[in-house]
Amino acid sequence: VTSLKTLDLTTGGGAAWTVRAVEGPAPADLIDRPVAATVPGEVHTDLLAAGEIPDPFDGDNESKLHWIGRTRWSYRTTFSWAADGNDRQELVADGLDTVATVTLNGQEIGRTANQHRSYRFDITAVLVAGDNELVIEFEGPVAAAEAERAKVGSWPHTNLHPYNELRKMASNFGWDWGPDVATAGIWRPIRVESWSGVRIDSVRPLAGADGVLNTFVSLAWTDTASEYATVTVEVGGTTQSASVKPGWDTVAVTNTVPEADLWWPRGHGEQPLYDVVVKLGDEEWTGRVGFRDITVNVAPDNDGTPFVLSVNGKPIYVRGANWIPDDAFVTRLNADTYRTSIQDAVDAGMNLLRVWGGGIYESDDFYDVCDELGILVWQDFLFACAAYSEEEPLRSEVEAEARQAVTRLSKHASLAVWNGNNENIWGYVEWSWRVPLAGRPWGAGYYLDLLPKIVAELDPRTPYSAGSPYSFDQFIHPNDERHGTMHIWDVWNQVDYTTYRKYKPRFVSEFGFQGPPAWSTLTSVVHDAPLDPYGEQMLVHQKAFEGNLKLERGLGEHLPVWKDIDDWHWTTQLNQARAVAYGIEHFRSLFPLNTGAVVWQLNDNWPVVSWAAVDGHGIRKPLWFALKRVYADRLLTVQPREDELVVAAHNDTDNAWSTEVTVTRRSTARDGEVLARETFTLEVPARSAVSNALPSSVAVASNPAGEYLEVRGADGASTFWYFVEDTSLELAPDAFTTEATSTPDGYDVTVVATALAKDLAFFPDRLDPAARVDSCLITLSAGESHTFHVTGAKAPEWIGVPVLRSANDLVN
């Protein structure tokens, strides 16, 4: 018989915590002075809430607060406990960040060295009836990482700090899009559990498309337990039980739900979820599952090695984005913040998010929302851009962490791929690691042996990939475009974005291009006067190596170099959107050779110039609107093929697509003269792509600088083609008129084109940071109109540059 009682030690549960600096480079007045703390929380957020530090995101405060990562911190609380007659008491910490010593009533009860796992400490002999004092002392993470390096040796990595020495969120030490705010704290819930006999240790409910739910329940027993226990599993109107002999650590219970409704990713069906209840005496565990099967086909074919993700036997073209921690201080995230950000992916037409290996295993709130909204999750194990020791003590921590992560996340219907690491196999092959490694193991044993074995044991229904990128053959370069998954980073780092068309990748799991955040986001934290891309504070919020130089070089012949800071902001945002859209249009035109694109990246963790589509204040950048267009279920593009132009159509729906397509060659001038027009019927089967060659009457321009193609389907799908870059394109100044009208929730701005108006964008946050707009990057031919709908603000008295922008105003 189980009798489990829980005492919540979080702030929300009523516990009063303080944090104090113990020793290190903290200001003298903070040493040994208690500051009110929140649990779950972290040092930075506690000091910020108490007014002890300025906002780390503002200005150049980041570097002024680096002392926090080198200071030892102590969290302390007292709590009252009443003896309850149970045999065993344990302190359960779901997350301690990272290197910590835990004491209760002055007695050490445990030490930790891994942010990514939970800990359970036996406190039966230490806990007393009445008042108890709990102290958790954290080493400064930067100091701890450096101390570990000094002890066990250095391993190649890509950061100022040796983040790979610790099992801690890598990007907390800074990244090329994130701040260096290495912190510490009790970052997930903490509690006392008191129990007798037997308790539930973990539950793994694995549901398949056949309606069968296999639930694996791990049990913990006291030494004196002598009675059989009964485990009951309820799901979908079915109930099954199993009797368990004392001491047995795992029991499997099988339920079959007749005619179970299948779970599908968005765009392919519904997302029915079934409540699962597991009972053991008076203890109850609840969760949700979706019945589905997921596979990845990597069987070699005539073109190399595919990477085809299928759900319930149906191939899925992946339209995705990479996900980084949604706040540099992850304890500020909750179910609502996750839902808002994941909705950004849904609204952009995505069906997959890749949880990147330099972050965290997100809370269940993240995966719950993905389950509900039909967003597949590609989950990296947490190894990124570095070599990792395979020796103790790190190896045991890696195994414990991986077992816990797979056990916790395996229930989620959205979980589609376990991935061993981010770029580490590629790094070993190509990033000059071999000399400093001097023959030492560097992590391959994790990715090729330990982790796949753990996944096969605990979550055999979910595919595993050793890395990203990965060719699925140790004798083929891991970033070979013909095999498996590919990261394309010569675009952005070295070459023009038109290079995307030189690749024919089977699956692209990273690619991207930088651009600044919204103007209001940028100016809320950057206070240089005058504002300049190379200003002191601006550079604090540009973390990429030579980032501003790459922004300028990336313009190529596409757009002119900016004349002022307003033009810089608009030009680089526009170029980011165009570059990424260019790549996705090309990848989708290659279907079925190409089976997916996962852009870097969806989100930001603070206000910064980055690759994100949605900035650190949650404002959708022009890139996001470009993604919404190119991730549409049905996409029309114009693609060059050898010596001709084709209309490429990708139909990513379950219904055949038949539409009349009109291709018009027009003048860019004010009259918008129609120079030639061709019409044809496009027939695209379900989940297919076709290409139609264009006749020379429209494909060949008489005056390339003054002409363009307008391609429109009768069902509303459309695209444009230009014969020259904007720097040579004859775009009329003053190519449109505007009118603003109030609406109940904001206002409308209607734009009427008098000539080709290219890439119209309205930025209401420049007038009011709370304002949001529903559309962006709209191209109009002469005589056409578009209405931007703005919410959260009142109609302005004036509209013009820099609030309303277009490509026209950059070249005139």
What is the predicted function of each stretch?
Residues 1-352, 482, 489, 589-590, ...:
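Secreted/periplasmic carbohydrate-active enzymes, especially glycoside hydrolases
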Residues 19-21, 25, 182-185, 453-455, ...:
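Substrate-binding clefts and catalytic carboxylate motifs of secreted carbohydrate-active enzymes
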Residues 49-50, 94-97, 139, 290-295, ...:
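Short, solvent-exposed turn/loop segments enriched in Gly/Ser/Thr/Pro and often Arg
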Residues 98-100, 143-144, 297, 325-328, ...:
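Flexible loop/turn segments at secondary-structure boundaries
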Residues 115, 176-179, 264-265, 322-335, ...:
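The substrate-binding groove and active-site-proximal loops of carbohydrate-active enzymes
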Residues 298-431:
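Substrate-binding cleft of carbohydrate-active enzyme catalytic domains
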Residues 351, 416, 462, 593-595:
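Short acidic/polar active-site loop segments enriched in Thr and Asp
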Residues 389-474, 618:
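Active-site neighborhood of glycoside hydrolase catalytic domains
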